[in-house]
Amino acid sequence: MAISILGAGAWGTAIAISLGSKKDVILWTRNETTFESINGKRESDKLPGCRISDNVSVKLAIEDTINASVTILAVPTQSLRKVCQQLHNCNLKKDVAIILACKGIEKSTLKLPSEIVNEILPNNPIAIFSGPSFAVEVARKLPYSMVLACQNNTLGSKLVSELQQENVKLEFSNDIIGVQICAALKNVFAIACGIVLGSKLGFNAHAALITKSMSEIKALYSAKIGDGSVDINTLLGPACLGDLIMTCTSLNSRNLSFGFKIGNSDNGFNVQQILSEGKSVIEGFSTAESIFNLAGKLKIKMPICEAVYRLLYESASIEDTISVLIS
């Protein structure tokens, strides 16, 4: 089974390194510097020291990716619509399975990644690939656990077999909505946890905040489904609790580090400056706005997410933010 990966950031490249050890992989990038770097050094600047197999061919033209039987989308969520439209314009075949490896909620529409794909490529089957997985550890082929969510059991089982590696424990789920909600929210909570840690409020407050975060995940998850039901296996599995713990406790997390810099700044922080200092997208920044608006649309209270939103977008003080986070 040929596999294309769209997005040559740290995460997309890590997946390419993992799968490329045994499969032919096409890795698409829009960045000519990245293209030349990988082709010249067989290494990405985002993952120094991690060799990219010769089985991975790098392409600049998206039309060179459409003949694979599986397409993995590892682009930022706010760029997903544009990439899907490009695939549509290239006449992507209807039987090509699309695996979403991006996390977030589109700001302009409040749609999940699967809803964006369904809108533009309605005939292509969709799966979600999510869980606790730092790109650098995946690229180094350290052990990790993920969830492959798909509403088609036959396709899901086939994709699990294709993505399974010796160092990966891959669990199957039908819960594509729950898995995506958890994946998006954890980045906002990681920013909140970073603020608490950066403000030196201690691990007790940090642990309490993670615990309260689970309640907000459950609230949005339940409201988004509409019937109040949630899958406890999703909440307590790798895609939710596992990813939340990892993202909210390690400074390898871009979102936690972002929040830490804010909390450690004594109110003298500049959000745009901190964002510009990083080499990668801080998904939680965009997601905070999306979650704030989605919670309003669904008429639910999410005080942690609201506090992070008001700090990032409405210049709320760190003191006012912390009073909510530790209340």
From Swiss-Prot:
EC supergroup of this enzyme: oxidoreductase
Keyword Cell division: no
GO cellular component, one term: cytosol
PROSITE patterns xrefs: NAD_G3PDH
Catalytic residues (positions): 186
Keyword Nucleotide-binding on entry: yes
GO BP terms: carbohydrate metabolic process; glycerol-3-phosphate biosynthetic process; glycerol-3-phosphate catabolic process; glycerophospholipid metabolic process; phospholipid biosynthetic process
Positions bound to NADPH: 11, 30, 103, 135, 254, 281, 283
GO molecular function, one term: NAD binding
Binding-site residues for sn-glycerol 3-phosphate, renumbered to this chain: 103, 131, 133, 186, 243, 253-255
Cellular localisation: Cytoplasm
InterPro entries for this protein: 6-PGluconate_DH-like_C_sf, 6PGD_dom2, G3P_DH_NAD-dep, G3P_DH_NAD-dep_C, G3P_DH_NAD-dep_N, NAD(P)-bd_dom_sf
Span of the signal peptide: none
Family designation: Belongs to the NAD-dependent glycerol-3-phosphate dehydrogenase family.
Chain's role: Catalyzes the reduction of the glycolytic intermediate dihydroxyacetone phosphate (DHAP) to sn-glycerol 3-phosphate (G3P), the key precursor for phospholipid synthesis.
Protein name per the record: Glycerol-3-phosphate dehydrogenase [NAD(P)+]
Natural source organism: Wolbachia sp. subsp. Drosophila simulans (strain wRi)
